[in-house]
Amino acid sequence: MGAASGCRWPWPPLLPLLLMLLLPPPPLPVALALDSALQPGNFTADEAGAEDFAQSFNSSSEQVLFQSTAASWAHDTNITEENARRQEEAALISQEFSEVWGQKAKALYDPIWQNFTSRTLRRIIGVVRTLGSANLSPAKRQQYNSLLSNMTRIYSTAKVCFPNKTATCWSLDPELTNILATSRSYTLLLYAWEGWHNAAGIPLKPLYQDFTALSNEAYKQDGFSDTGAYWRSLYDSPTFTEDLERLYHQLEPLYLNLHAYVRRALHRQYGDRFINLRGPIPAHLLGNMWAQSWNNIYDMVVPFPGKPSLDVTSAMVQKGWNVTHMFRVAEEFFTSLGLLPMPPEFWAESMLEKPSDGREVVCHASAWDFYNRKDFRIKQCTQVTMDQLSTVHHEMGHVQYYLQYKDQHVSLRRGANPGFHEAIGDVLALSVSTPAHLHKIGLLDHVTSDWESDINYLLKMALEKIAFLPFGYLVDQWRWGVFSGRTPPLYNYDWWYLRTKYQGVCPPVVRNETHFDAGAKYHVPNVTPYIRYFVSFILQFQFHQALCKEAGHQGPLHQCDIYQSTRAGAKLRAVLQAGSSRPWQEVLKDMVGSGALDAQPLLDYFQPVTQWLEEQNQRSGDILGWPEYQWRPPMPDNYPEGIDLVSDEAEASKFVEEYDRRSQVVLNEYAEANWDYNTNITAEGSKRVLEKSTQMANHTVKYGIWARKFDVANIQNFTLKRMIKKIQDLERAALPFKELEEYNQILLDMETAYSVASVCHANSTCLQLEPDLTNLMATSRSYEELLWAWKGWRDKVGRAILPYFPKYVELTNKAARLNGYEDGGDAWRAAYEMPFLEQELEQLFQELQPLYLNLHAYVRRALHHHYGPEHINLEGPIPAHLLGNMWAQTWSNIYDLVVPFPSASKMDASEAMINQGWTPQRMFKEADNFFTSLGLLPVPPEFWNKSMLEKPTDGREVVCHASAWDFFNGKDFRIKQCTTVNMEDLVVAHHEMGHIQYFMQYKDLPVTFREGANPGFHEAIGDVLALSVSTPKHLRSINLLKSEDDGYEEDINFLMKMALDKVAFVPFSYLVDQWRWRVFDRSITKENYNQEWWSLRLKYQGLCPPVARSQGDFDPGAKFHIPSSVPYIRYFVSFIIQFQFHEALCQAAGHKGPLHKCDIYQSKEAGRRLADAMKLGLSKPWPEAMQLITGQPNVSASAMMTYFKPLLDWLVTENGRHGEKLGWPQYNWTPNSARLEGSFAGTGRVNFLGLNLEEQQARVGQWVLLFLGVTLLVATMGLTQRLFSIRHQILRRTHRGPQFGSEVELRHS
């Protein structure tokens, strides 16, 4: 609200309001004598003498007012001590002038002036005789002036500084104003609001109390009960306060509906925590420091966002509008009505922009009358915005008023009442803001005239006009209470009582009587009456309606534009030229036909949006008002440190769009470099990988740091919040550059050591892991040959990786801590978004343990039968090299040794595949066919052209570990696999194709969401299909199994084969990250890496090393995922949920019968469920994806137990028949190959459980194992009882399993 000079009255009592000293006042000047020429002469004490008195006063007053105004202008446009001193000198002269002329008027005319026949003369004498502060003694007058100066200085120089910093401080204009207008960060808005109210308000309170006492003392001498009574007298109505209350209540329903609608929109933005739909709105969220107008949050509340924007700020900037042009456009509007142009002095002397020469100025927009009938100016720190364009018209309205009444007596050069002066410019702004007018002046390309556009426009106007009404009403309600003595000493309590009562807003932080929040509003310390604005907001719509009628407008009032109507201009001119020479009621009646303030034109103007708001609020079930009026919002987290965080969702959307666009390029280049290296291991390829890793890290850091500028806690859009939280995690890129380079090099060196390693015979024949050692471990039944391969691989790979691993752990932990996690394990577990992940996983493991222990006991007996008692102890752990796999993670390769019914039909399709000439490509074509049979997507041409489906024969070194690749361009997806034509690799092919299908289903999501719902989901999809592929029914359908036998023995054989793959894997997949998590949290140190590894393998798998291992060995490093830093618990999760998926999809496919016989091939309904879940990617929490597939959101082992129920029953019977002991009570047994007699000569070391340890380590180990043994014995006894009852239990039961988050590596293993 422009409230400065344009709203100052020229009569003496308010001349002190011109004192705006922004610097500490200089020493009080010596008393200045008023020039004798300005002293009143001798006049007769009658009406004729009074006429002469008024004429003489007019000429003298113009001189004094010009000098005083010029001094104030000089100070406000260049705040210096010298200008402050000159301003105060001029103010003192003005007060002395007021005193001598006022006292003269009282002495001569007090008995008779109210009986003068001239109404105009009565009005002039009435003004002159009211002295105001000039009634005070000279000492109190100086005290009064000093209080005004200091209050103005405190307000004008107050600043809010950034927390813990002094360099970054914000002034109200433009910094804090812009923050309140544009920020959507709850915490930043709070800091700006609280900072300003503290900085400006608190120091003012004692000064305002003293000012109030002096002001009341002065006006009581003029016959008023207090200052408020004088202010109200300017409206010359005995029922003024009652009229105002009537008007307010007439408008209140419209405000309440607007309030409820806006509150609902703010609730969408800030959520339940900060917005109570039954309470007041926190006062800092409405786009304005005082919540007096809400148009700055229009973007948050716009009814129909698809309609063209009505904020033409961007058009003004694009068209090159500057500040001068804005004022020329406003001037042209006035002249188009036949009103006066601005005089040359206006353009020569006004300050229309904030000076760039370093001067301190008072930026508050104001219009100035220099009382010489030619010099009129505006002071405004204008910015090129639509909002400021309205302010320009408002201020120029004041100047037009000055121009029109400049020939009136100086005492009558004011508005008909104070509200008139504020209304004139705003009347024109009502026309200027219409889409039709904006089109006329080239700021809107098209005028969209439809109902939705009208509602948008009217709501935008309501945010400015209706939202202001209660604030415009309450400010002086509070001050009148202060002046009357009703409010003190509870200034702040009453201020917030009124603001809650009328506005429905509340303070966002605790406020008390040490605060003085009313003082944070310009008009309070600058002693500018405020009820004028409430009056003006009523009047301007009365004026607008009358002028539109005069202009011949037809149609809704809100569409009227009086531009170029000279008839409207003539009517307006009559009001302006009258000044205050006539009662305002007469002037108003001449203008609108009625002499009373009337809210009906305002209600008519907003009628369409009023009805729309009522309907919206009823539809939303919103409560009008704030019944929970005592509610206050909580303090935000991380306040005030997090104030610079951004919660503006529009800005956040732009950020994630840019991140997504750039990420696709960077990730594609990173994937290509890694692919080239993995399919051709060379030094040049290694160098390129490191370059792209650095590029990727830089990208991650750049956007991660940018993402950390967003306040995700206060972003309400779920998708935005989820994306930004993920981008904020810099992962390894959080490391300093040198350490990041070192980290990347360590990973590359470890992975290279793993990938190129080979084990050589004495004759120099060397075997690589793929396919040589893998085939040997799968097919050999020679104890010694298996031992050679097992030991050779670990000696070659593990020992090579060990030197790198401690540093890798250190850097992984450092990166995790830099990302806000406790250690690397904590960071990995965070992907599952579960506070009790470890406990939930343990529960799942315990549910599956009976199945594993029975399988372990059965397989151990079979191995005992094959290898004999010297190699197998029926009550001890199994040597780890005998289970058909380098890591004993799956045992399906020893199926021939453990087959329950050897005479039953064989189900291994490997031989048929070879005999039928299957190739690796044929295997993947078959997998692709399975997916398409479900109605899922076929792989694109790029897949067949670019994948590496076989180990190259050209001598290239490659990483053979099977993996699926997403190149992040929406069309390039590949698999890298050294495929062997056998049944096992056919299953692997389906597993990897499951990853590819997942990639294709979520390819249109933002990059951030192109991951599985949780890491286990991505691993499970292909395996779900493999459960069908493995069934005899499906193998027959693809001609890989000819036998039609499908009896009990075949069922048990099939389930045994599946259990060797699925059940045997459960403890290994569980323990790998149990070990790593403990390494990361330092409960396992580098001195006992290997010892703890084998402790866990013994505890969970019941395995022991076949040869003595020492701490110089590093057997975990012999598993791909350890040197490659790939989290492993995902596989444990995937092996459980794949059975849940299988069970649900089988139901969808209409399968009847045992779960293990289900084949979902060609079921479109099963495919639809899978596709719906995969399309979500990571965009929703994983329970939602689980719900789409299974109909419930939890992870449970029950489906897996159901699947293997027939086998478990058979195993329990078979183990019981042989008297097998479940578990490994002789846990300290080691095979002959691992035994060495006594101590290691000359070393002081001993052999313990196959480990080469210090004697003290061995002693500790013995005690630990004794404790484990007792525990295991108790557990075994309990387990035996449980197993006898388990056959009679219904395994289908609801289980509230863990709820996982997700994160996918670039390569899926």
From Swiss-Prot:
Residues 1281-1309 are cytoplasmic. Its EC number is 3.4.15.1. The record marks 1236-1237 as: Cleavage. The dipeptidyl carboxypeptidase activity is strongly activated by chloride. The dipeptidyl carboxypeptidase activity is specifically inhibited by lisinopril, captopril and enalaprilat. Binds 2 Zn(2+) ions per subunit. SUPFAM superfamilies: Metalloproteases ('zincins'), catalytic domain (SSF55486). Gene3D superfamilies: 1.10.1370.30. The active site is at residues 395, 523, 992, 1121. Monomer and homodimer; homodimerizes following binding to an inhibitor. Interacts with calmodulin (CALM1, CALM2 or CALM3); interaction takes place in the cytoplasmic region and regulates phosphorylation and proteolytic cleavage. This is Angiotensin-converting enzyme.
